[in-house]
Curated annotation (Swiss-Prot):
GO terms for molecular function: dolichyl-phosphate-mannose-protein mannosyltransferase activity. The lineage of its organism: Bacteria, Bacillati, Actinomycetota, Actinomycetes, Mycobacteriales. One of its GO terms (cellular component) is plasma membrane. It is a multi-pass membrane protein. The keyword Ligase does not apply. Pathway: Protein modification; protein glycosylation. It is an enzyme of class 2 (transferase). Protein O-mannosyltransferase that catalyzes the transfer of a single mannose residue from a polyprenol phospho-mannosyl lipidic donor to the hydroxyl group of selected serine and threonine residues in acceptor proteins. This is Polyprenol-phosphate-mannose--protein mannosyltransferase. It comes from Mycolicibacterium smegmatis (strain ATCC 700084 / mc(2)155). The chain crosses the membrane at residues 113-133, 143-163, 166-186, 234-254, 275-295, 384-404, 413-433, 437-457, 473-493. Its EC number is 2.4.1.-.
Length: 516
């Protein structure tokens, strides 16, 4: 429904025509070209699988894991052979929750303790991330073409690519966070569809709080996925908080758009309780469930700490197993809290979060420049570096600025949602600047950067009231940019995969002094 034009004079009419009812948003609840959308998604996903799985088992460090794979690949192997738990290191400590290592163990179960085995699950998750980004971009832009563009961009992102091909935990965190975001985008559309039908049925004004929205299974799924994110790395908690606030704001805005008398109080009355359940109880339950092998173990780290370092009595009737898990969690937290520069913890490839948006300080995962054949008398260089594709990451600041402007000035919810996801992976790290940090913490920011760029390209393609010449120019601009990103990715491919290159080429690949 739309308001009739009240500014145009009409002969024989002494008063302006007014709308017979309140104006509500048009019934747009998602893309309609399902067949084309899934066909496009299948093609993009197949391309992602080729890039993520090609020569996946290489490189290794003389048959052993590289960089921090040295922590997680062995721990996953222990999980596989110790009934789901890592070896108890005695004086050491296992400092991350179990889900990521449980997933790595699946690949090791299938292919053995080798490069393919410990990287297989991460590559599968990398392909799923590409599919999710493609579907999210298509849904929020209402354009299958924009979805395809986003898919190509995430395929060609160096950070997403390398993280998918190494046995670190971040790729699993990214998959769960992005999947939760995808669920919430579907939930947003479903809420508006329910509000629309409630408006047509006259149920909006039944109370001043507005109608109840019923069971929201997509939001429930988001809660489960966020619990898995927290059970991979604790930084998943940031997404629980940011996404929880985001969905409540979406609910309040929907109630306002459909003329609920008190939309914000209606959100607090109708939506806050269910949201607290989904973003509080469900993730916590999933997190505890991920420790089921730990609870069942007799030898897991700190499993029977009650009665040893902590007393047998408790003020609250909490089971000893949960008290032991709390002690274990606190010990791991203390480890992370003390991993600071002030305490003498330094690493040649550490970085601070203000360098992450533009990939100013990447991480060198592996390098071999001694007696590598293929470059004549001089040794070749084989290296794997986690670095963002410059054609995307170097423009991050203006992209984020534009997204903020669209959110605040134009009230464009799409950019606002993407900013929430990006900032959930970025802002919390400023709370403890002295902590030792690395660029791979920014892996979870990459999909949201890609989504923001894809939305901008979509706005260039579909700018309203364009004449044919401007439409053609916009199409050429978008094609040129996507080709530039793919070319940039192809140029950097050797240092993303460990292919041998000459010393001269290596120096050409290192664009900034801070990359050394």
């Amino acid at each position: 429904m739309t308001a009739l034009d009240t500014d145009t004079p009409t002969a024989g009419r002494s008063a302006p025509l007014i709308s017979p009812g309140p104006v509500i948003p048009p019934p747009d609840f998602g893309p309609l070209d399902r067949a084309q959308g899934w066909a496009m998604t299948a093609i993009i996903t197949a391309l992602a699988a080729i890039t993520r799985f090609l020569n996946l088992g290489s490189p290794t460090d003389a048959g052993t894991p590289i960089f921090d794979e040295k922590h997680y690949a062995p721990q996953a192997w222990q999980v596989l052979h110790n009934d789901g738990v890592e070896d108890n290191p005695g004086y050491g400590l296992v400092v991350h929750p179990p889900v990521g290592k449980q997933l790595i163990a699946i690949g090791e179960w299938l292919f053995g303790y080798n490069g393919l085995g410990w990287r297989f699950s991460g590559a599968v998750c990398g392909v799923i991330i590409v599919m999710l980004v493609t579907r999210i971009a298509r849904r929020i832009s209402r354009s299958t073409l924009v979805g395809a563009i986003a898919g190509l961009l995430i395929i060609a992102d160096g950070v997403s690519f390398v993280s998918s091909r190494t046995a670190l935990l971040d790729v699993f965190l990214v998959m769960f966070a992005v999947a939760a975001f995808a669920c919430l985008m579907v939930d947003r559309d479903q809420v508006r569809e329910r509000m629309y039908h409630a408006f047509l049925d006259g149920r909006i004004a039944e109370t001043r709080w507005g109608t109840r929205l019923g069971v929201r299974w997509w939001r429930f799924g988001a809660g489960v996925l966020l619990g898995l994110a927290c059970a991979t790395k604790w930084s998943g908690l940031y997404f629980v908080l940011f996404f929880g606030v985001m969905t409540l704001v979406f609910d309040a805005i929907a109630r306002k758009q459909y003329h609920v008398p008190h939309p914000w109080r209606g959100m607090l009355r109708r939506d806050l309780g269910p949201a607290a359940y989904v973003f509080g109880l469900i993730p916590f339950a999933v997190y505890l469930a991920s420790y089921a092998p730990w609870f069942a173990s007799e030898t897991a780290v700190n499993r029977y700490e009650v009665g040893r370092s902590i007393g047998p009595d408790s003020i609250l009737p909490i089971p000893d197993a949960l008290r032991s898990l709390w002690h274990y969690t606190h010990a791991a937290y203390r480890f992370h809290s003390n991993l600071t520069n002030a305490d003498g913890n330094h690493h040649p490839w550490e970085s601070k979060p203000w360098t992450w948006p533009m990939s100013l300080r990447p991480v060198l995962y592996a390098i071999d420049n001694q007696d590598v054949p293929g470059c004549g008398a001089q040794s070749c260089v084989k290296a794997v570096m986690l670095v963002g594709t410059p054609a995307m990451w170097f423009i991050a600041v203006p992209v984020l600025g534009w997204a903020l402007w669209r959110t605040v000035v134009r009230r464009d919810w799409r950019y606002g949602a993407v900013l929430v996801g990006y900032m959930a992976g970025f802002l919390p790290w400023f709370a403890d600047i002295d902590r030792q940090m690395y660029f791979f913490y920014a892996t979870v920011m990459a999909p949201f950067l890609v989504l923001a760029i894809a939305l901008i390209l979509g706005d260039i393609l579909y700018k309203p009231n364009q004449n044919p010449e401007r439409r053609t120019l916009g199409l050429l601009t978008v094609c040129f940019y996507v080709a530039l990103v793919i070319t940039n990715f192809a140029w950097m491919y050797p240092i993303l995969t460990g292919l041998p290159i000459s010393q001269t080429t290596w120096n050409l690949q290192i664009w900034l002094p801070s990359w050394r």
